[in-house]
C-alpha cells in the first residue's frame, strides 16, 4: 500500500469512528485526504519540480498537471483539492462539514491515481 492510499484508509477509519476524535473527526479526515492528494501530486510532479527554488506550490502543480496530463484529470484534482481545503479551513461563522460530505470527498481521492 502506498503512503497516499494509507492516508485515505486512515481518513475512512476516522470517519467510521474507529479513531475517537469526537467532533473534529470530519475536519481531520478531510486533512488526511488532502495530504494524500498532495502526496500523489508530489509524486506526479517529481520529475519537473525537484531541485528548484522556490518549491512549487500545490496550486502551481495543479496548473502544470493540466498542461502535462490533460485538463480532465487536472480539473478533477483542482476541484477536489479546493473542496478538501474548504472543509479543513472552515470559519467560525460556518458550519463544520458533515461526515457525509467529507466521506463523499474522501471517496473521490483514490480514483485520481488509479
Model-derived segments and their meaning:
Residues 5-13, 31, 35-39, 75-86, ...:
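Generic structural signal for well-ordered, non-membrane alpha-helices
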Residues 15-19, 35-40, 56-67:
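Short, mixed-charge, low-aromatic patches
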Residues 2, 6, 28, 72-75, ...:
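Alpha-helix boundary/N-cap detector
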Residues 48-114:
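Long, charged low-complexity segments
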Residues 1-24:
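Charged alpha-helical initiation segments
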Residues 23-45:
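Short, hydrophobic, well-ordered secondary-structure elements
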Residues 14-22, 43, 47, 87-91:
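Secondary-structure edge/capping motif, primarily at the C-terminal ends of alpha-helices
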